[in-house]
Amino acid sequence: MEGIHMLRDLLKRDDYLIKIDLKDAYLTVPICKAHQKFLRFLWKGTLLEFACLPFGLPREKLRKIRKKCQTLLSGTEISVRELSKFLGLLTSSIQAIFPAPLHYKHLQRLKNTTMSSTQSYEAIVTLDTTAREEVVWWRDHLQAWNGKALFQQPVDLVIETDASRKGWGAYCEGVSTGGPWCSEEKRLHINCLELLAGSFAIKTFTKDKVCAHVRLMMDNAAAVAYVNKMGGTHSQTLANLAIALWEWCLENQLTVSAQHLPGILNTRADRESRIITDSSDWKLNPSLFQAVLRIWGPLEIDLFASRLTYQLPQFVSWKPDPLAIQTDAFSMNWGKIRGYAFPPFALIGRCLRQALSQKVVQLVLIAPVWPTQPWYPLALQMCTDLPLLFPMSTDLLEKDHQSHPLTNLQLAGWRLSADVSKQLTFQRKLENCCWQHGEEIPPVLMPQPGISGLAGVLNGKSIPFQYL
């Protein structure tokens, strides 16, 4: 059948097109005398018929769809026959409305389900919330999306993606990344995980891309099909994931296509999806974190986190992450932010040096109470408030509902600053330490296990903990 698909195959780069305004030229195309009676219309009481070729205005088609949408929204039920007609009206617009397939698949599934169970076109379909939302989209967005590019934009970015039962992986332009699934994601079918991996990969590697066409290389045929067709009707979960991916891409002015990559060649992304070895990615119990916010908030950026452990809407990851605003906290300037840092313990000293070198005004640090560590005296010196001592418990730290293996870990929260005036203001409020060198520390009335009640002594001043 001749149409826009044939034209796309005939044209090539640097061809010239001539546009003819048929507003007048179409009047030169005659209609067979015997067929003119089929082109009659009534105007001001007079019956007229076309002797030449008539052309309808595109806006009339738009009005027809919007009018039908309004009719559907005025009620809650429709027959399968009428729904089929409406779907035919929508599917006929695919060549002109780019995101059309995203917004009728639920209606299509509703029709198929009803037809399968009743075997009758006269059966009544009740429009649920999702169905009505699709109709509303057509009513409200039809004009804005009217007009679709004839040719697909050239590919700007190629991303290889893969999924395993452990996690997801991706590779793009020499950079590899990946991460584990959360407990809810692990229960999904592998096809869904493959599509989710593609979604994570796009969000990870397109943070600085606008108006770009992204090509996903995937070794799962179902995921490829659902991306290219903007959804499907066989799997509701897969369809929802595909719609969510496309809506995010359109919101960020991106287009996406998928291509099958044989599994034997998809080695780089596959490797990332199976090597899940980050044992330092944990977060403070959310209830304790909220207590920290109430005392020292608001805080702006979580400097050491991942999509499974972040505590603030904006966070920085140590490797490319779909939700992180940036990678590598040490490459940032902390001087003008109210940062929250729960770094791997081996990086605590580096964090303190970064805060000093960048003259950080305030940093909330979560760190263990390890007085013998080289960084500990510096942490005491930078304090601007009494450190918060967290109770030891099995749920002190968590990640995806898992407990940290170190059940006797003693953590504290520290409000730090590189501003010497703030440090001195805090130190003036402290009491003098009355202990002499060599004296035994007196027992506290309400001792914390393994803790004297003091964070330490600085310049002859005692720095006690405050307890949560």
For the regions a language model picked out, list residue spans one by one.
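RNase H catalytic domain
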Residues: 202-271
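C-terminal functional segments of enzyme domains
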Residues: 94, 255-296
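Class I S-adenosyl-L-methionine-dependent methyltransferase catalytic core
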Residues: 300-468
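Reverse-transcriptase-like RNA-dependent polymerase core
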Residues: 23-48, 55-61, 99-100, 106-107, ...
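C-terminal reverse transcriptase regions that engage the nucleic-acid substrate
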Residues: 9-12, 49, 58-150, 263
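Conserved catalytic palm subdomain of right-hand nucleotidyl-transferase polymerases, strongest
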Residues: 1, 6-28, 78, 82-85, ...
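A short, polar/acidic, helix/strand-boundary loop motif
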Residues: 2, 45-55, 71, 142, ...
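Two-metal-ion RNase H-like nuclease active-site motif
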Residues: 18-22, 152-165, 302-306
